Structure formats: structure tokens, C-alpha cells
A protein has these predicted regions:
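Core beta-strand elements of the Rossmann-like FAD/NAD(P) dinucleotide-binding domain
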Residues: 7-9, 125-134, 172-173, 347-356
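A conserved short coil-to-beta-strand element within the FAD-binding core of flavoproteins
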Residues: 104-119, 329-347
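Short beta-strand to alpha-helix junction loop
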Residues: 72-91, 103, 274-282, 307-319
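Beta1-alpha1 glycine-rich phosphate/pyrophosphate-binding loop at the start
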Residues: 9-13, 18-102, 204-205, 292-298
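Glycine/threonine-rich phosphate-binding loop and adjacent beta-strand/alpha-helix elements that clamp
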Residues: 356, 360-369
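Feature captures the FAD/FMN-dependent oxidoreductase FAD-binding
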Residues: 77-143
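Rossmann-like dinucleotide-binding core of oxidoreductases
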Residues: 5-8, 13-18, 22-37, 41-43, ...
């Protein structure tokens, strides 16, 4: 047994992802608390280490999706990709001297409070038990695949995997690929693999509200200012903070200054679409994107949700609709009835022969351990 497991810590932190690292930094600043981070993987990063599917990136601007106490002047673009976020988290772990407080390859099975000892007891798969006076859970929700309940899913004889467990060893070239799901994960990887497969069928249960993504690469002058001009990086980060808060207040708080300001600012768009509330601004942006990127009117109808924008996650992207328009890509909106050895059967009576199934069906967000 690890000798450290006999020690009683002030705080045990579960997970060395963004939440765990942020908690550790604040405990280090306090300097009066002994703590240990228990991380199941071999490195930090949490979801940004475990998820590696093509096209994975953050839909929050990079200078806002980072710690205020560890501003990064070297982000290469507005919306960073997975590897860049993981590099950032690895770097700050060392820069802030957090790594010595992390026990890697330590999968937590349970944490329970011992009322008799007035301590938390955290049990690992290895059999070790760590005790602490306080417990901080930094366990994320975006790492356990959610598999659809489709009859015959286990009978498929071809290759299959979930986007959360991307099989990089499998060559998709010249394969007939079925993608089940069209949420954020699928919308991320579909454009990246569409050109390499011989045929792709995207099975869509319901469309999502998709809006334009204002993404660009930072030029050398901008990065110079972010690194060397006093307070510029903090001001730029606050700029993104303000935009996010403005959108929240305007979207969820009706008839306030922010919502009225934005409605006036894009009155031309609102008039065109006969929409008069702030959340309709996003809908207008989505409809404009569809108009610009899709020519077939009947195809457009399949991509417009029948529910109000904001009921589900709004997805920013510029390359999903063009991917669906490729000659080797088709969108299937008939519901899946069952899966057989080499086919997907839809409820309209058709059969689709395929070589591989990629499940882009998201995560089981109700399971933490």
C-alpha cells in the first residue's frame, strides 16, 4: 500500500482536468492545506486527453476558455483544437507547480463520508484508501460514451466504434461509413473524414441549430501584443468575457438593455426573417448559413429544427453543411429500425449496406464514476 494513503489530507481532489487543476491552484495559494489529486489517466487534461476524434475543438473562444491566473498569449486561433488545449493544461500544471501533488493512474471507485471518523474515505481500484477532511469532485461528464439502444447493434459484423473512443488504428479510406448521431461530436468529425471515405450516410434523428463560427488564426502582430503589451491579454480576455455575458443576459433575460441593443444592431436581419426576439437572432444566423451553403430547397427543410433555438445546445460550425453536400455523403432522416450483420435498416423499409459504424451519440452525463 502507498505510504501516502496512510496520511490524512485536508483535501482530496478527484480528477486532474480543468476543474481539478483550478481547485489545486487555489489550494496552493492558501498554503495551509495539504491536498492530493487522484487522476485515473497517465496525464492531466480530463476530457481533453480522453477525447481525440478528428475535428475536436472548443466552441468557447480560447482566450476565455483558460484560467484568468494562467493567461496564454500563444493561442493560435479563436477556437483551439484538442491538442492545443491539452498542451495548455500540461504547461500550466508544470508552471504552477501542481504536478507533484497528482497521483496518476489512480482510478477512484467511490468516495464516502465516514461519520464516525468525520473523514472522507476515497477508494481506488488498486485497493488503496485515501482519507481527507474535505473532498472536491472535479469529475467531468464528457468521457463515458453513450451508446444508442438499437435492436441488433451487437450483431453487426463490420467495424464499429464510438467517437469518444476513436479508433485511430482503423483506416477509413474507401470504406462505406455510417454515422449515427449528429450532435457536436459528429458535426466535428464528419467534415474531417468525409473526403477519405467512399461513402458516408449520416443518420439524423432531429436537426440541430447550427450557427456561423467566427474562427480565425491569430497573426504574429496580435500574438506579439498579447505577450508583450502590458494588460493587453487581460483586456482581450475581458472582451470575450463581456461578449459571453452579453449573449447570456440578452438570451435569457428578456427586454433588457443587451437584448434591445442586439436587436437594433441587426434590425435588417430581423426584418428579413420577421423575427423580433433576441434568441431569434441566432435562428436568423442559422437560416442565413443554410441559405448560403445549401442550394436544394428540399434539403434545407431537413436541416431546420422544429423546436425553439436554445432548447438544445447551439453548435457553431462553418463546414458541416458543405460536408453534407459532397457527392459521397447523404443525410438519412428516416429512423433506424434495426442493425444486422452488414446493414442498417430504416423504418421506411430501406436497407443501407455499410462497412463501419461510427457512433456520434454523445456521452452518458449521469455517470461520474
Amino acid at each position: 500500500m502507498d505510504s501516502n494513503s496512510k496520511k490524512i489530507y485536508d483535501v482530496i481532489i478527484l480528477g486532474a482536468g480543468i476543474s481539478g487543476l483550478g481547485s489545486a491552484y487555489n489550494l496552493l495559494r492558501n498554503k495551509n492545506s495539504s491536498f492530493l489529486i487522484l487522476e485515473k489517466n497517465e496525464g492531466v487534461g480530463g476530457t481533453w486527453r480522453e477525447n481525440t476524434y478528428p475535428g475536436l475543438c472548443c466552441d468557447v473562444p480560447s482566450h476565455f476558455y483558460s484560467f484568468s491566473f494562467a493567461i496564454n498569449p500563444d493561442w493560435t486561433k479563436t477556437y483551439p483544437e484538442q491538442y492545443e488545449i491539452l498542451d495548455y493544461l500540461e504547461n500550466i500544471t508544470d508552471k504552477l507547480k501542481i504536478r507533484p501533488f497528482i497521483k496518476f493512474n489512480s482510478e477512484v471507485l467511490e468516495s464516502k463520508f465516514n461519520e464516525k471518523e468525520n473523514l472522507w474515505e476515497t477508494s481506488l481500484r488498486s485497493g488503496e484508501i485515501y482519507k481527507s477532511r474535505s473532498l472536491i469532485s472535479g469529475l467531468g461528464q464528457l468521457n463515458k460514451p453513450k451508446w444508442p439502444e438499437i435492436p441488433g447493434i451487437e450483431t453487426f459484423s463490420g467495424h464499429s466504434f464510438h467517437s469518444a473512443e476513436w479508433d485511430h488504428s482503423y483506416d477509413l479510406a474507401n470504406k462505406r461509413v455510417a454515422v449515427i448521431g449528429n450532435g457536436p461530436s459528429a458535426i466535428g468529425f464528419i467534415p474531417k473524414i468525409a473526403d477519405s471515405v467512399s461513402k458516408m450516410i449520416v443518420f439524423q434523428r432531429s436537426p440541430n441549430w447550427i450557427v456561423p463560427k467566427d474562427d480565425r488564426i491569430y497573426n504574429s502582430f496580435e500574438r506579439f501584443c498579447l505577450r508583450y503589451v502590458p494588460f493587453y491579454a487581460k483586456m482581450y480576455r475581458f472582451y470575450w468575457f463581456f461578449l459571453q455575458e452579453r449573449n447570456y443576459l440578452a438570451f435569457y433575460q428578456k427586454h433588457n438593455f443587451f437584448s434591445k441593443f442586439v436587436e437594433r444592431a441587426i434590425s435588417a436581419v430581423l426584418t428579413k426573417f420577421k423575427l423580433f426576439e433576441f434568441e431569434k437572432v441566432y435562428a436568423a444566423g442559422s437560416l442565413m448559413l443554410i441559405d448560403e451553403q445549401i442550394q436544394d430547397e428540399s434539403f434545407k427543410d431537413k436541416l431546420i429544427p422544429d423546436y425553439p433555438i436554445g432548447c438544445k445546445r447551439i453548435i457553431p460550425t462553418n463546414d458541416y453543411f458543405p460536408a453534407l453536400c459532397k457527392d459521397n455523403v447523404s443525410l438519412e432522416t428516416s429512423l433506424i429500425e434495426k442493425i444486422s450483420s452488414n446493414k442498417i435498416h430504416t423504418k421506411d423499409g430501406r436497407e443501407h449496406e455499410i462497412d463501419v459504424i461510427i457512433y456520434g451519440t454523445g456521452f452518458d452525463t449521469n455517470i461520474f464514476i
